[in-house]
Design a protein with these regions (language model features):
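Acidic/histidine-rich helix-loop elements
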Residues: 55, 80-89, 118-121, 200
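Generic low-polarity alpha-helical segments
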Residues: 5-9, 33, 67, 203-204
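Serine-esterase "nucleophile elbow" of acetyl-processing enzymes
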Residues: 31-85, 95-104
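Intrinsically disordered, low-complexity proline-rich regions
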Residues: 13, 39-40, 171
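Short gly/ser/thr-rich secondary-structure transition/capping motifs
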Residues: 28, 90-93
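N-terminal secretory signal peptides and thylakoid transit peptides that target proteins
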Residues: 1-19, 23-28
Length: 208
């Protein structure tokens, strides 16, 4: 296994640990016996290419690994991955009401905002969209985890700071769980470029 793959899989495992421990998934009861009827817990993931397995073999992204981790711990939850590569917070906001109605999730993970930054969109709009999505999920009786992102320094110190902080504000204002930086341990390590695909945005899982 190459270094990039190992780093990415390790990161996925750590993210899964965080979501289980801090994202409300630890509260899911394990099955006492194999014959028990599993309760209906549904985890809805609304994200972009980082969650949609863009450029990766099916079943190797962090969402699939989280599903495997929950199964390993005998936590009977179904994960619905409604992520779309290239999606923005505006796109997610427009899609979320129908997703909530269709799946009636017990938990919602919001991994959006990166493409807003790549397109230079107004961060006030990004924050408003994430806040609206969080509020909608809470009103649907779901526990919410907001997944934060960061942008490189070349975006400007002020923009990078404001972008990072908007996720914190949304989570704090709505009392949602927060993953401060989705790519911590991947994008912030020396020579991080080797851990990414050619677009230098999405982590690389392929052997070199």
């Amino acid at each position: 296994m190459n270094v990039a793959k190992r780093h990415f899989l390790t990161h996925c495992s750590l993210l899964g640990t965080f979501l289980i421990g801090c994202g409300g998934l630890s509260a899911l009861p394990a099955l006492a016996q194999s014959g028990d009827k599993p309760p209906k817990y549904t985890v809805l993931v609304v994200g972009d290419s980082l969650s949609a397995e863009y450029g990766l073999a099916r079943g190797t992204g962090w969402v699939a690994l989280l599903q495997a981790r929950l199964a390993e711990e005998k936590k009977p939850a179904q994960i619905i991955n409604a992520s779309i590569s290239g999606d923005t917070t505006s796109g997610g906001r427009s899609r979320l009401p129908a997703l909530l109605l269709r799946y009636q999730p017990s938990h919602v993970i919001l991994e959006l905002g990166g493409n807003d930054a790549l397109r230079g969109l107004d961060l006030r709009m990004t924050e408003a969209n994430l806040a609206a999505m969080t509020q909608a999920a809470l009103q649907a009786d779901a526990q919410v985890t907001v997944v934060g992102m960061q942008v490189p320094p070349n975006y400007g110190t002020a923009y990078a700071r404001d972008f990072s902080q908007l996720f914190e504000r949304v989570a704090k204002q709505h009392k949602a769980a927060l993953v401060p930086f989705f790519l911590k341990g991947v994008a912030d390590v020396p020579d991080a470029v080797r851990l990414f695909q050619a677009d230098r945005i999405d982590p690389n899982e392929q052997d070199q």
